[in-house]
Amino acid sequence: MPKMKTHSGAKKRFKLTGTGKLKRQQANRRHYLEHKSSRLTRRLAGDKLVFKGDAKVIKKMLGV
């Protein structure tokens, strides 16, 4: 059986923490920030953890 390939899109979007959880960036903070409030852009600043159910699928894509 051949090796599983890592999903390139998932590889770019998610990072694995030391404890095995997955980190992701929030959407809506790339461009067109002029019309978005400062409050919103600050709120979207930090990374978030991926929910358990989603993490299972993403880990499979990453080959973890």
Swiss-Prot record:
InterPro entries per the UniProt record, alphabetical: Ribosomal_bL35, Ribosomal_bL35-like, Ribosomal_bL35_CS, Ribosomal_bL35_sf
GO function terms (MF aspect): structural constituent of ribosome
Family stated for the protein in its record: Belongs to the bacterial ribosomal protein bL35 family.
Residue ranges, annotated region (Disordered): 1-31
SUPFAM superfamilies according to UniProt: L35p-like
Family annotation (HAMAP family): Ribosomal_bL35 (MF_00514)
Keyword RNA-binding assigned: no
Protein's UniProt name: Large ribosomal subunit protein bL35
Biological processes annotated in GO: translation
Lipid metabolism listed as a keyword: no
TM spans (from-to): none
GO-annotated cellular components: cytosolic large ribosomal subunit
Domain of life: Bacteria
Keyword line: Ribonucleoprotein, Ribosomal protein
Pfam name, any one: Ribosomal_L35p
